[in-house]
Amino acid sequence: MTSMTLDPPLTNPLPPGSELVAGVDTHKNTHHVAILDLVGRPVADREFRADGRGYAQIVAFLHAHGDVVRIGVEGTGSYGAGLARALTTAGLTVIEVARQDRQARRRRGKSDPLDAHQAAVAVLAGTA
């Protein structure tokens, strides 16, 4: 009988120059940001307030983790509009990500970290 080993979670900093993508699940009062490497492995995630100070913290958070080349943002026409402007002003590339079907979200459960992760995956997959 063979046993399967799982890779440990990513705990070491990425090498300098590593490219990353991010996804943001937007809401009226908070935004949840997930950063992935180009293979889709989680690098970091965190929740921020949805205001000017929070936007600045998001930009700093993204820059602190490396070269974030694309950011998938849900709701750039509504709750994500201010954030999309702040990210674009900071020189970051923003891609509109469609919110997932409500019925599908209910089946798997609502999770801001998971929704942010899925937004980043959509950017990686080119489906955003």
Residue ranges and their predicted role:
Residues 1-128:
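Phosphate- and other anionic-substrate recognition elements at nucleic-acid/protein interfaces
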